[in-house]
């Protein structure tokens, strides 16, 4: 049995992190989402993976280069997930599982879905958090059978569909999927798009039973920036909690002066130098140095080729990508993609895209005077995230000047610059530079002013 991983969406809700990459290539604990999905599929006992790749498909091909178990099929732009799935039919000759490329799965849930699929079409159900039913296409089940679906319902519903299991007999329904959703209430306005849930609804209308498996995990869907921050925090907790003893790779050393309140996993040729403080479990890649009094205050994941030094502070739950520098007095909490440079008394909480360079003393606000959460605009819709709303989100390849300030919840697009001394209170689009224009006065001055 194979798994199909869908990676065809544009990821506009995840702005700015899906501009220069496929949404499924966004990293969680330094591994792309689609790589986590493929790993979970193989751990569940599936034999192969087919990835239906939309934007930036070449990045996904590069990620799985040399892995003969994974086939990446570019599908271009489609009219929705159902059409993305139909585009890879030639790769599938028997029953198969469909996973979303932007979702984190537990292998046990995928294995349970595969077992259910042996008895007919099946779906994996994840519980909808309280109050979030209007954000999802929801489902109801009874007695292990799917009863109905409804798009973004007004009244609470218990589940959403996180993954699918289709038999070959389902292909006529997959290939005939409409772009006009029927399963909505009066007043709802669905986009013209082929959703996988519409295929399942057609199966039900045809009298075909669809079995259900309720996921033990939350099957976290990474659709918006704050969900990416949450996904990384949860993955750090999961990976670090599995670390039960110190594990040092070849050539790695820990100085006797280091204070470790937990366990450490080091890759090859790593150094933890004098006076470092580690309060939690720490996972580190290869060729990384953590030296000169650096403080890591909780569980963390740090990539390869990093330099963490000179009394900097990394908060618990954080992720540093590969080839990052966190230097003199820098304070960081959140997620940094690869090749990020943090230095000289800067302070940041949120997400930093790859190759971001923060100027000295760049800081971000994290607390509003009303003690509330920042209201966001996601594709024009007002949203108030329950978590991480006040974090700062900086896109890939951005820079800041010295003393730049981010207000709570602001975002910058890719390839943008926040100039010296700027207080950024609103989102900055991609490919823009904002410079502070100040008014100054020049007057004469001399020793005469002092009575000479």
Features from the language model and the residues they span:
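The conserved acidic donor/metal-binding loop of glycosyltransferases
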Residues: 100-104
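Conserved donor-nucleotide/metal-binding helix-loop-beta segment in metal-dependent transferases, i.e.
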Residues: 108-134
């Amino acid at each position: 049995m194979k798994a199909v991983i869908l990676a065809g969406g544009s990821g506009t809700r995840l702005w700015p992190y899906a501009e220069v990459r496929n949404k499924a290539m966004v990293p969680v604990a330094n591994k792309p989402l689609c790589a986590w999905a493929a790993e979970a599929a193989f751990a569940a006992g599936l034999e192969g993976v087919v990835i239906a790749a939309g934007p930036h498909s070449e990045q996904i091909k590069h990620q799985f280069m040399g892995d003969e178990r994974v086939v990446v099929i570019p599908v271009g732009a489609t009219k929705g997930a159902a059409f993305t799935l139909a585009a890879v039919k030639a790769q599938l000759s028997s029953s198969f599982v469909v996973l979303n490329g932007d979702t984190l799965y537990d292998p046990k849930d995928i294995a349970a879905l595969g077992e259910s699929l042996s008895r007919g079409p099946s779906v994996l159900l994840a519980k909808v958090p309280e109050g979030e039913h209007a954000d999802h296409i929801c489902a109801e089940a009874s007695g292990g059978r799917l009863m109905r679906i409804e798009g973004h319902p007004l009244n609470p519903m218990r589940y959403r569909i996180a993954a699918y299991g289709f038999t070959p007999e389902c292909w006529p329904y997959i290939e005939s999927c409409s772009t006009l959703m029927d399963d909505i209430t009066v007043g709802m306005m669905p986009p013209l798009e082929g959703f996988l849930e519409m295929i399942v609804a057609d199966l039900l209308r045809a009298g075909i039973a669809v079995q259900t498996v309720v996921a033990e995990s939350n099957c976290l869907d990474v659709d918006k920036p704050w969900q990416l921050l949450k996904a990384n925090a949860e993955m750090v907790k999961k990976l670090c909690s599995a670390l039960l003893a110190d594990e040092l790779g070849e050539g790695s050393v820990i100085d006797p002066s280091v204070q470790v309140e937990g366990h450490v996993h080091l890759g090859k040729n790593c150094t933890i130098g004098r006076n470092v403080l580690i309060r939690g479990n720490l996972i580190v890649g290869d060729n990384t140095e953590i030296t000169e009094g650096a403080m890591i205050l909780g569980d963390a994941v740090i990539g390869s080729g990093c330099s963490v030094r000179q009394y900097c502070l990394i908060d618990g739950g954080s992720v540093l990508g590969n080839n990052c520098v966190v230097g003199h007095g820098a304070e960081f909490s959140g997620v940094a993609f690869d090749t990020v440079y943090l230095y000289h008394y800067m302070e940041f909480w949120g997400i930093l895209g790859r190759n971001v360079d923060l100027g000295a003393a760049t800081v971000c606000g994290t607390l509003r005077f009303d003690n509330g959460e920042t209201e966001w605009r996601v594709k024009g819709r007002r949203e108030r995230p329950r978590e991480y709303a006040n974090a700062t989100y900086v896109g890939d390849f951005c820079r800041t000047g010295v003393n730049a300030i981010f207000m709570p919840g602001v975002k910058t697009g890719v390839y943008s610059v926040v100039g010296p001394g700027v207080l950024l209170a609103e989102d900055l689009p991609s490919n823009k530079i904002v410079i502070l224009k100040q008014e100054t006065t020049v007057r004469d001055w001399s020793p005469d002013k002092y009575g000479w």
